[in-house]
């Protein structure tokens, strides 16, 4: 079983994030975001990751958003924004990305994400759906959403 952990905001995590920057693309970089948040080891962190041994191999950021200010879901309910999900090369296709998304789904809140880098097939397998584009709301992004009810609507035999 793959364990998802809340990542500490500290210099060790900063060093781990540098490995992602070496392989990833700039828009997925969390270095600056982490540097801005380094305060103390026990600070509440929006970063989650998966370790293989002592090496961070997959990560994402997850934020709770007040739905009243950014309506993606009916009743303008609060939701999670899942950002910058990334798995290091050599560790891809082992279920780490799926484990991170399933962890986010375990909060039983709607989720919004903005897919990157030819990842539509992955998000489709995870049962995320496109939303009707709204220029004022989406500002050039192409968000995908998931709602807990979406997984309950799946037919028997399908997997999330």
From Swiss-Prot:
Signal peptide: none annotated. InterPro entries: Acyl_CoA_acyltransferase, GNAT_dom, YlbP. SUPFAM superfamilies: Acyl-CoA N-acyltransferases (Nat) (SSF55729). The keyword Acyltransferase applies. Keywords: Acyltransferase, Transferase. CDD domains: NAT_SF. Residues 7-151 form the N-acetyltransferase domain. It is an enzyme of class 2 (transferase). Transmembrane segments: none annotated. Coiled coil: none annotated. GO terms for molecular function: acyltransferase activity, transferring groups other than amino-acyl groups. Its EC number is 2.3.1.-. This is Uncharacterized N-acetyltransferase YlbP. The gene is ylbP.
